[in-house]
């Protein structure tokens, strides 16, 4: 079996186009356009790239985009004050604080200070809690985007044995909750997990998010499995690769995401969609 590629770029573009249509409809109805504030603290090169893609996506769909590029010396109180200001700004529907933050800043404290109704990253405890209670509000962007990618395959996830490799707060844990909502039977692994190979070989649906190139050998993949590779790793030769051995995995999977061009574009598209949702809810 040779896998079909899940084209994250094409699916993300379709979602962005849909959001753009909604924005144009709001304008024609005399309603305001959504606004997104993006806060970057410090000058981490990877964060600058991610923030740039988010700002570009905002412009493409017609959002108001506010950029706050702060020095790495920014204090916690200064950042909290900016978040408070944006919480009270009616023209801003979404507040995004790019992670990771410098070590002198408490990321949890900052995220909890964002109004949950403007938490378009979906990281606030209130939004994560709603996902746990099967009452999703603003959902974490990467897991939400992955659900859209899975839906694009046309395969009903109900009853599938799903394996999430990696238990981070950003991807792994909320991904498990999303798959439970999709009625999968879910296992989440971490560094203390035993017999990882056996679990991978049994998985109908595999989501890998560990940040280690080629961490999952392709020959472990179950024949016909859906493989979602969240990892994006740059090798010494400059090539970008995922956490799964793509070459071997694509010969066994039924569907697989490429790296790059798979999950990454959907994360940004989901952020844009969340911002529109936040705007629509604030207008009700």
Swiss-Prot record:
Pathway: One-carbon metabolism; tetrahydrofolate interconversion. Keywords: Amino-acid biosynthesis, Histidine biosynthesis, Hydrolase, Methionine biosynthesis, Multifunctional enzyme, NADP, One-carbon metabolism, Oxidoreductase, Purine biosynthesis. InterPro entries: Aminoacid_DH-like_N_sf, NAD(P)-bd_dom_sf, THF_DH/CycHdrlase, THF_DH/CycHdrlase_cat_dom, THF_DH/CycHdrlase_CS, THF_DH/CycHdrlase_NAD-bd_dom. It catalyses: (6R)-5,10-methylene-5,6,7,8-tetrahydrofolate + NADP(+) = (6R)-5,10-methenyltetrahydrofolate + NADPH; (6R)-5,10-methenyltetrahydrofolate + H2O = (6R)-10-formyltetrahydrofolate + H(+). One of its GO terms (biological process) is L-histidine biosynthetic process. GO terms for molecular function: methenyltetrahydrofolate cyclohydrolase activity; methylenetetrahydrofolate dehydrogenase (NADP+) activity. It comes from the Bacteria. Transmembrane segments: none annotated. NADP(+) binds at residues 166-168, 232. It holds the Pfam family THF_DHG_CYH. One of its GO terms (cellular component) is cytosol. The keyword Oxidoreductase applies. HAMAP family: THF_DHG_CYH. Homodimer. NCBIfam families: PRK10792.1, PRK14186.1. PANTHER family: C-1-TETRAHYDROFOLATE SYNTHASE, CYTOPLASMIC, C-1-TETRAHYDROFOLATE SYNTHASE, CYTOPLASMIC-RELATED. Belongs to the tetrahydrofolate dehydrogenase/cyclohydrolase family. Catalyzes the oxidation of 5,10-methylenetetrahydrofolate to 5,10-methenyltetrahydrofolate and then the hydrolysis of 5,10-methenyltetrahydrofolate to 10-formyltetrahydrofolate. This is Bifunctional protein FolD 2. It comes from Colwellia psychrerythraea (strain 34H / ATCC BAA-681).
């Amino acid at each position: 079996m040779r896998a079909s590629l899940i084209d994250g770029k094409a699916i993300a573009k379709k979602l962005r186009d849909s959001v753009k249509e909604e924005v144009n409809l709001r304008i024609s109805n005399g309603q305001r356009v959504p606004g997104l504030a993006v806060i970057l603290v410090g000058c981490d090169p990877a964060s600058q790239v991610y923030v740039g893609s988010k700002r570009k996506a905002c412009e493409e769909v017609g959002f108001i985009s506010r950029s706050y590029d702060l020095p790495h010396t920014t204090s916690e109180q200064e950042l909290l004050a900016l978040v408070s200001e944006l919480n009270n700004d009616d023209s801003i529907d979404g507040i995004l604080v790019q992670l990771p933050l410098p070590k002198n800043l408490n990321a949890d404290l900052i995220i909890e200070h964002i109004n949950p109704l403007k938490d378009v990253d979906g990281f606030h405890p209130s939004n994560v809690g709603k996902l746990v209670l099967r009452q999703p509000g603003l959902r974490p962007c990467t897991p939400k985007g992955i659900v859209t990618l899975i839906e694009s395959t046309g395969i009903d996830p109900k009853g599938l044995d799903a394996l999430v490799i990696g238990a981070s707060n950003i991807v792994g844990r909320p991904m498990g909750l999303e798959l439970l909502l999709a009625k999968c039977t879910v296992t989440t692994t971490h560094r203390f997990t035993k017999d990882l190979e056996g679990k991978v070989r049994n998985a109908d649906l595999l989501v890998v998010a560990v940040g280690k190139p080629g961490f999952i050998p392709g020959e472990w993949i179950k024949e016909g499995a859906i493989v979602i590779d969240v990892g994006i790793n740059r090798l010494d030769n400059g090539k970008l690769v995922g956490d799964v051995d793509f070459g071997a995995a694509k010969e066994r999977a039924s569907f697989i995401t490429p790296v790059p061009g798979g999950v990454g574009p959907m994360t940004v598209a989901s952020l844009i969609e969340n911002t529109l949702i936040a705007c629509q809810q604030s207008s009700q």
